[in-house]
């Protein structure tokens, strides 16, 4: 039966579902310690149930004074490193490193399952979070006592929407205006959601009016928004799917992260360029999460020899999707055997090498997982050495296909093709053309044709999966990588495995709708002809008129 949102608050629906169906504890606001910005009782309960020896070695809970020292250190770690890093890597206190979370276990490890079951997922309504203000946040979610997310909820029945929730975060949840509100401070909480019964928006760093909220919607009919839900609330997938324990664990383990990138900026006082480290707190958008999860599921179930076309428009965050996919593909197992021995990312963007390295290093301490191959020799060495992730440039693609189809035919590979910048970077097409014919390309925009020609000329090797990311695939690309779908008339149509359309990107504000600002040739010609033929014609007025055409 569809839920009657007019009879139940959205808050009640969400909290009740997490408590009754997802196995969350329901907390109360007084559980939250405003001094430390976390739930001390649940942190203590989690640690005592899993790490008694470490507690004894450090005497961290033997007195109120020792407890205060422990929680002060933990709170400082949240501020410095961020909650996701503390959950993944734990934190050091005196001589011990305390685990703050136990990750999702494999099916082959019953002991790990027992530890995972010790994790405490908790949802709290109306959290009073500040020492100075009496404001409360609608919904607060914690894991082992550490803050994961906050939510401000609205519903159309009361005449408010997600935009009102965003406004509330920007105007009433400014961390600079209230330093005692630790849950609002940078890094200490992974994500903040603005939710109504139709739409979801998210923000990873609250900065007053500068807070940037991104859509976390599924998309509907190729555009923005969410499809109708059988339960009546279009946003029910948030608590029914995304916030399930295994799903939330997956996001925290494999997607959420803090990245650092060096950028040259101009010093306003000296005028000189200086290097500045840009910090970004990342939480996946829904289409990224859905895409990577579907690709992993299909790979796990179908093994090697598959082809996938991912049609993601500009503004989709392809670079992050590619890094998340590459990192997780190398971890897929069939029993105890890796499904893929190596994942190869074919790109023209050198910066993607750095991005993948940085992203993976933020997940686990894994040395030499990623290698960059910019020559035939380094590529050959990386392949022969069995590197887990190899990033290489496009004109080495012919060698890759030949190598994995002959001397490495007993190994299994995943090939991720990054075509994101094919229409923006002429050098990519030129390199592909040189690889094929030794000549400079006449058409700078035919990267897809080059890749297709290479693959056709050598045939698709059976010991590899292909994951082709592109914004606007040509018919040949659809035929080569798309999923075959038989039609009623007997013909076979090839469709993308996953889509984030240009229409959705435009409606969500990630790219401009150029059609709103174009001028027809007829209008342009008419104005130019009039101006040239009449020296007294008002050019300013003509330009204004042209803009309105």
Predicted regions and their residues:
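ATP-dependent helicase/translocase motor core
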Residues: 1-342, 351-366, 395, 405, ...
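Short glycine-/polar-rich loops that comprise or flank the Walker A/P-loop
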Residues: 146-148, 187-190, 340-341, 387, ...
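Catalytic P-loop NTPase motifs of RecA-like helicase/translocase cores
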Residues: 157, 423-424, 476
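Structural recognition of the conserved hydrophobic beta-strand(s) that form the central parallel beta-sheet
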Residues: 193-194, 390-393, 464-470
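Interdomain helical connector at the RecA1-RecA2 junction of SF1/SF2 helicase-like NTPases
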Residues: 229-232, 476-549
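Conserved helicase motor
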Residues: 347-350, 370-380, 394-399
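Conserved motor-coupling elements within RecA-like helicase/translocase cores
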Residues: 362, 376-390, 406-407
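Conserved RecA-like ASCE ATPase "motif II neighborhood" in helicase/translocase motors
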Residues: 387-419, 423-434, 441-456
């Amino acid at each position: 039966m569809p839920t009657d949102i007019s009879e139940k608050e959205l808050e009640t629906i969400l909290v009740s579902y997490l408590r009754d169906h997802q196995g969350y504890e329901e907390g109360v606001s007084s559980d939250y310690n405003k001094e430390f910005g976390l739930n001390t009782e649940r942190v203590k309960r989690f640690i005592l149930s899993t790490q008694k020896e470490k507690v004894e070695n450090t005497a961290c809970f033997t007195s109120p004074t020792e407890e205060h020292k422990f929680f002060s250190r933990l709170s400082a770690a949240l501020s410095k490193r961020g909650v996701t890093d503390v959950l993944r890597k734990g934190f050091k206190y005196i001589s011990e490193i305390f685990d703050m979370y136990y990750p999702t276990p494999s099916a082959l490890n019953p002991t790990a399952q027992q530890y995972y079951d010790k994790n405490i997922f908790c949802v709290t309504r109306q959290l009073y979070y500040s020492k100075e203000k009496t404001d409360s946040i609608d919904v607060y979610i914690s894991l082992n006592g550490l803050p994961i997310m906050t939510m401000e909820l609205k519903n159309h029945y009361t005449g408010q929407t997600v935009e009102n929730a965003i406004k509330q975060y920007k105007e009433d949840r400014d961390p600079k205006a209230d330093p005692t509100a630790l849950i609002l401070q940078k890094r200490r909480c992974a994500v903040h959601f603005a939710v109504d019964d139709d739409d979801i928006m998210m923000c990873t760093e609250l900065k007053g009016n500068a807070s940037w909220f991104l859509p976390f919607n599924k998309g509907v009919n190729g555009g923005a928004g969410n499809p109708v839900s059988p339960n009546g609330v279009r946003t029910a997938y948030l608590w029914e799917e995304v916030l399930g324990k295994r799903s939330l664990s997956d996001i925290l383990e494999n997607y959420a992260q803090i990245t650092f990138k060096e950028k040259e900026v101009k010093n306003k006082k000296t005028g000189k360029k200086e290097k500045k480290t840009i910090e970004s707190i990342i939480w996946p958008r829904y289409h990224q999460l859905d895409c990577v999860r579907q690709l992993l599921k299909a790979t796990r179930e179908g093994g090697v020899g598959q082809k996938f076309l991912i049609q993601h428009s500009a503004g989709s965050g392809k670079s992050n999707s590619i890094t998340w996919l590459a990192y997780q593909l190398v971890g897929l197992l069939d029993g105890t055997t890796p499904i893929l021995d190596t994942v190869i990312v074919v790109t023209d963007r050198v910066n993607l090498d750095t991005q993948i390295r940085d992203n993976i290093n933020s997940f686990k301490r894994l040395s030499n997982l990623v290698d960059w191959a910019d020559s035939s020799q380094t590529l050959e060495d990386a392949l022969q050495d069995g590197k887990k992730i190899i990033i290489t440039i496009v004109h080495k693609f012919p060698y890759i296909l030949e190598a994995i189809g002959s001397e490495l035919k007993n190994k299994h590979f995943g090939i991720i093709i990054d075509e994101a910048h094919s229409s923006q970077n002429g050098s990519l097409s030129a390199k592909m053309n040189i690889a094929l014919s030794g000549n400079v390309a006449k058409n700078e925009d035919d990267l897809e044709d080059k890749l297709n020609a290479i693959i056709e000329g050598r045939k698709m090797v059976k010991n590899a999966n292909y994951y082709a990311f592109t914004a606007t695939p040509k018919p040949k690309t659809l035929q080569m990588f798309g999923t075959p779908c038989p039609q009623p008339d007997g013909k076979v149509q090839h469709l993308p495995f996953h889509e984030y359309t240009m229409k959705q990107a435009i409606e969500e504000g990630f790219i401009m709708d150029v059609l709103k600002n174009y001028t027809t040739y007829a209008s342009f010609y008419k104005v130019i002809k009039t101006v040239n033929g009449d020296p007294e014609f008002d050019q300013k007025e003509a330009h204004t008129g042209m803009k309105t055409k």
